[in-house]
Amino acid sequence: MKVLAAGVVPLLLVLHWKHGAGSPLPITPVNATCAIRHPCHNNLMNQIRSQLAQLNGSANALFILYYTAQGEPFPNNLDKLCGPNVTDFPPFHANGTEKAKLVELYRIVVYLGTSLGNITRDQKILNPSALSLHSKLNATADILRGLLSNVLCRLCSKYHVGHVDVTYGPDTSGKDVFQKKKLGCQLLGKYKQIIAVLAQAF
């Protein structure tokens, strides 16, 4: 299920994800503007690069932890079950302007954040003893929240962008156990792939 929402208010909801809360509720703000609660840091782009590098450095370990925790048939069928075949994933163009790349990064991080929330919720039910996986998912979500905050600051402070249409990650609540595991694996495969591209692009 895709939910389109616009602007800073849904973003602020995403910035306060609770693990396992699923997709944030869509809210359409009235005349969305750049409302930042705290001053932006001077070295925002360095922080964004650092956070992307941190995510890129841990993405493969998260992917391995995930598919290992799912058990068979996942570890021996990665291409078939965990290929990054996510059709509604937001696009990214590495050769765009900084502003265009930041807008696309914003969309991607919102999508990934809600996806991770759904994956974490599902894994706590499907694999309650996989504590290292839960911890890694939570740590990744924390970095994504910080990254999102920095991207918002940069877009608002430098480019006066207060309105971006976003697509949230797919809701898995109505899917069966195998489909939840498979979609999670595909999303983390896509995450591993795109985060490497993003880390190189900034």
From Swiss-Prot:
It is found in: Secreted. Gene3D superfamilies: 1.20.1250.10. Its main location: secreted. Glycans are attached at residues 31, 56, 85, 95, 118, 138. InterPro entries: 4_helix_cytokine-like_core, Leukemia_IF, Leukemia_IF/oncostatin, Leukemia_IF/oncostatin_CS. GO terms for biological process: blood vessel remodeling; cell morphogenesis; cell surface receptor signaling pathway via STAT; decidualization; embryo implantation; fibroblast proliferation; gene expression; immune response. One of its GO terms (molecular function) is cytokine activity. This is Leukemia inhibitory factor. It holds the Pfam family LIF_OSM.
